[in-house]
Structures are given as structure tokens and as C-alpha cells.
Amino acid sequence: MSAGIRTYLELMRYKNCLMAGFAAAIGTLIAFNILISGTSTPNFEDAFPFLDAGLVFLVVFLVSGAGNAINDYFDIKIDSINRPERPIPSGRVKAKEAFYFSYLLFALGTLIAFSINSICGSIALFNSLLLILYAKTLKGTPLLGNLSIGYLTGSVFLFGASIFGFGGIKALSVLFLLAALAITAREIVKDIEDMEGDSLEGADTLPLRIGAKKAGYLAVLTGLLAVILSPLPYFMSVLGLRYIYLVSLADLGFLAAIIQLLVRNNPTKSSKLFKIAMFFALIAFIAGV
């Protein structure tokens, strides 16, 4: 490979990969605490599996980096106009090198995931294939692209829990659903925010297909569903009272984001508020165990 390590790390968007890896490790921690608290009957030792949690972090880091690299490979034309400084359009990484590099990362991540257990491996393989499909096709498909990002981001927590088998997945399934709904809503809002630029680039997004107003209603509906379902982890005895207190702050943030979109027609502010609300939701997940 002709490019240096720093260039390939840039291609991976390593900072985002680090955050995704930490999120997966948090998923492992939350699932462990839920299972060990006696709300389920796990078949594993009481000691926290630090090695497997480290492998979970590594897998998500690699697969996320692969997804970013393959995304840049398919976005060469757009990035040459909008992001000419990126590794591929700037000529620092050849397109073929980026392509092979992404598949190498996908393969490494999936193999490591299968070394943890078959459930981890299956999720890693499915997500890798979905990331490739997203970069090639789904990214330009209205709604399906938004749903894909919602699933992929939410599944990071689910993947972290999967080291405990189906018991771990069951423990975090509601949290995965809430995260996926909130992220899908924000993705739609981001598309509304980017309508002008996407229109100039000839992109086919949900707001451009059905209009900003209808897309906004769908984002509001999805966000409200996340808010309405947010108490479920408490009522299902998955998380404790601290979760309710903190998730209430997140819910206020989501409602503020909805108001900015629906009443004030400000998708930029709405998108920022969604992001802040999701941060509080993550804190609620961690503290609520």
C-alpha cells in the first residue's frame, strides 16, 4: 500500500471508530450488569469478561472503519467536489487500495467476532454486508438508508451484549429499539437539513422524494415513538429508577428537537438537539443499571 498509516486511519475516520467501539463496550457493561443483577439467569461467571469486551471494541473499530472506507470508495465523485481533501479524492490513497483495505478490515473484524461466539460473528457478518450494500445502494434509497443507519448504530450496543449469547441480546433489545428509533429520526432530520445540497448533487433522499413537511412528520412520529417507549426498560425491570430520572432529561431534549422541527421549522437546531438528547439517553442507560 502506497499510503501511510495516518492516511489509512483518516480513511477509516478513526475517531468515529473509537466512539463506536466504546459504545459497544458500554453495551457489554450494561448487559453484564443487567444479567448479573438477577433480572435474568445468565450462564456465565460473575467476573466481567474484559478480554471479550476488548475484542468487541476491536471488532466494532475495524468494521466501522471498513464501512467508512467503502463508503468513500463509492463516493469518489461527490467527495471530489465536496470533500477534495479526503484521502481518495486528494490522491493520497488509490481507489483500489481503499476498496481492498475495506474488505481486509471487514474480514478481520468478522473473523475476530466469530472467535468470540457464533452470535457475535453472525452480527458482524450481517452488519458488514449491510454496510457494503448501504455504501453501494441503500445510501441513495429514501427511508431505507435512514433505517439502515438507525439499525447499524443501535446494533453496536446489541453487539456488545451478544458476547453473553441470546440472554445478552434479550437484555438489551429494548435499548437497541429505542436507540434505533431515535437515530432514524435524526437521520431523517439531517436529510431535511441537507435538502439544498442534496438537490444540487442529484441525491435521492426522503425529503426530496416526498417533501420536507411529510418527511418532518415521519421524523416527529419516529422520535415521539422513542419518547413514548422510553419508560419500558424501567417497567420491564431492565433498568432502575435512576434511568427514569435521566431518560426524562433525554425525552425533554427529544421533545425540544421535535418542536424545533415541527413548530419553528429549524432542522439544523433540531438535529443538534437530537444529538444532545441521545447523549443523555446513553448516560441514562449506563446509570440506570
UniProtKB/Swiss-Prot annotation:
Intracellular or extracellular location(s): Cell membrane
An example Gene Ontology molecular-function term: geranylgeranylglycerol-phosphate geranylgeranyltransferase activity
Membrane topology qualifier: Multi-pass membrane protein
SS bonds (residue pairs): none
EC number assigned by the record: 2.5.1.42
CDD domains linked: PT_UbiA_DGGGPS
One GO cellular component term: plasma membrane
Transmembrane domains' residue ranges: 18-38, 47-67, 99-119, 120-140, 163-183, 218-238, 243-263, 269-289
Cofactor(s) the protein needs: Mg(2+)
Keywords: Cell membrane, Lipid biosynthesis, Lipid metabolism, Magnesium, Membrane, Phospholipid biosynthesis, Phospholipid metabolism, Transferase, Transmembrane, Transmembrane helix
InterPro entries linked to this entry: DGGGP_synth (IPR023547), Prenyltransferase_related (IPR050475), UbiA_prenyltransferase (IPR000537), UbiA_sf (IPR044878)
Record field: catalytic activity: sn-3-O-(geranylgeranyl)glycerol 1-phosphate + (2E,6E,10E)-geranylgeranyl diphosphate = 2,3-bis-O-(geranylgeranyl)-sn-glycerol 1-phosphate + diphosphate
Pathway(s) where this gene product acts: Membrane lipid metabolism; glycerophospholipid metabolism
Domain of life of the native organism: Archaea
Family: Belongs to the UbiA prenyltransferase family. DGGGP synthase subfamily.
NCBIfam families linked to this entry: PRK12882.1
PANTHER family tied to this protein: CHLOROPHYLL SYNTHASE, CHLOROPHYLL SYNTHASE, CHLOROPLASTIC
Role this protein plays: Prenyltransferase that catalyzes the transfer of the geranylgeranyl moiety of geranylgeranyl diphosphate (GGPP) to the C2 hydroxyl of (S)-3-O-geranylgeranylglyceryl phosphate (GGGP). This reaction is the second ether-bond-formation step in the biosynthesis of archaeal membrane lipids.
Protein name: Digeranylgeranylglyceryl phosphate synthase
Source species of the chain: Methanosarcina mazei (strain ATCC BAA-159 / DSM 3647 / Goe1 / Go1 / JCM 11833 / OCM 88)
Organism placement in taxonomy: Archaea, Methanobacteriati, Methanobacteriota, Stenosarchaea group, Methanomicrobia
